[in-house]
């Protein structure tokens, strides 16, 4: 299917009468199968007028001289055609051009013009330029257009478009933890503009250009990451085109969020962008509220024609109410009203996160480019209130007090070299780099006296009851952890022929960490043993493309995960090496209008740390901190991605994921996990579907509507059972659920309005953290966005 061409039209005027008498010509250019063609340049030689068709293939000439004219239509990939047009005085002449493709040249044109998501070359993860169809693993990209269409205000709403990626927990309302392929991505797998960021906050989406999700192992590029996949948020950059955009969102529960985006050139070599937003909202949960301020300024300097420097800032200030949901009684979620908040009314939290990054891109020549990237991030989160909702069998709960503070700084440096070269008929696409991170984290522990605030019954909680006064907490301990990371890697995508490609890479990683704890009462500092880990992370992928629209692939990669604890010889534990295998197929149909990706995977951790059965002298071990790398987990599954733009204005996305993650080998000693048990918080099935359509013609042109559906299957909350535990069963079964969202919108000139009703069936379910933070999902809500382009 042809979407964008540059054509050359020659217009020959046969008659010319009465120069002062004019009319109007309105027209549309479509392909032989009825699709509008944008970007067509139309020239009228007699009047020296030219115009370009818009996205709908439409054009308009005003004040055109009256008379009969012959138009010759000619362009690469089309048969030459002629048409006669008569322009009458003060009248509008409506015409439609249907261009027939030239079969001799059409084949090549389709490849260049109609690009499917599988074939579109993307610069992903801050520099890796590659077509998804050439990658031996799964990649999904959610662009700003989809984010805007779906009115996403949280990253958790964006990832609803990605199969197998879901919110595993939302502990206390402070953050959202994302899971993929049975693994928690939150600790090390979340990036922004290619830099690892702290996952202790809820990221802002107002500045996002796209969200990239690379499924499977990414240790080759990033070192220590969980094997389920990595997520990278890419923010919008400065533009040398001047413009601005104001967006105001209002919705249920007093939600209000204006966002302003302004950009443009300062001169021929400097451009800027400033994105800012403010959010203020209450919640379907009584007392709970949130207030956020966000700033994202950026400047780009064109030092030379081949050199750019981008400086970007990112700042978020988030005031929020800690909310641990409803809690559980035994093996069941407590049946408390969805709106009931069980915490103290004075509970509060604050998160401040700021980043400054500098990125230098230098093009050495047409085939090679060099990137220098540097970033410093500061993170500060503090909250206090009642926590951990764990009532007894009749609902009585002694509300415990808690106060926590975390201060973190991450300094990151990256150097990447990317280029292409050939050896004979073999093409190489190389991506190599060196990276280093230094993370300093301080965790402050506070104590209350007494530790219990009061006692309530969760089924009969009255907000009007007078609460005890807010107690003061004393800082008792500060634990500081310093972690240094260094890695060097190289990757080569080798094109052996048009049908065969090989992706080979290797990374060496070094990681060093140490903790020291200051006990404030006696002013004593205890320093832990220094932990050092090194690991090689290889990657090998084979790609077979029997046709230009089919790609069969298989791959092997591994990753490493540092462990805590010591060996029986009082040494630090080695990192666990985790192996991952994938096979799959990527297929385009109907000239790229429909793309499908199917992936099968298996992830094996044969070095799972578990309590050692015996000590070095052969005696029975009772210290759970003494461990061996003798356990095993297996995660295996299937993922299906579907994407289609069957007609102009219609976008359809769908996905399905199956995952089975269990303990495949355990020691059986007291405290070890039970062999064959499924890991908690890992649903077997997830699915997603979205459809968005904008009318292209007629009186209702630019009217749009959409539907979004997301399914999370049955899963287990609580904790996994262990051998020798005193409690019969620590797991809590959680049912699956489906959520539907509907939206409708209209665009008129520079103004657009879009309204979304989310969770239209008012489904009730929960995101779960262990057994004490059961947070209900939001009920039916309405959100309206008003947007104006300057």
Where are these regions (language model features)?
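Acidic/polar loop-and-plug regions of large Gram-negative outer-membrane beta-barrel proteins
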Residues: 279, 283, 296-363, 376-408, ...
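C-terminal beta-signal and adjacent terminal beta-strands/loops
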Residues: 606, 652, 710-727, 745-790
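Membrane-embedded beta-barrel scaffold of Gram-negative outer-membrane proteins
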Residues: 363-365, 369-375, 379-385, 551, ...
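Gram-negative outer-membrane beta-barrel transporters
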Residues: 628-720, 785-789
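Acidic, small-polar-rich N-terminal luminal/periplasmic segments of exported/outer-membrane proteins
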Residues: 35-38, 43-48, 62, 76, ...
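Face-selective signature of the C-terminal outer-membrane beta-barrel domain
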Residues: 356-379, 400-516, 597
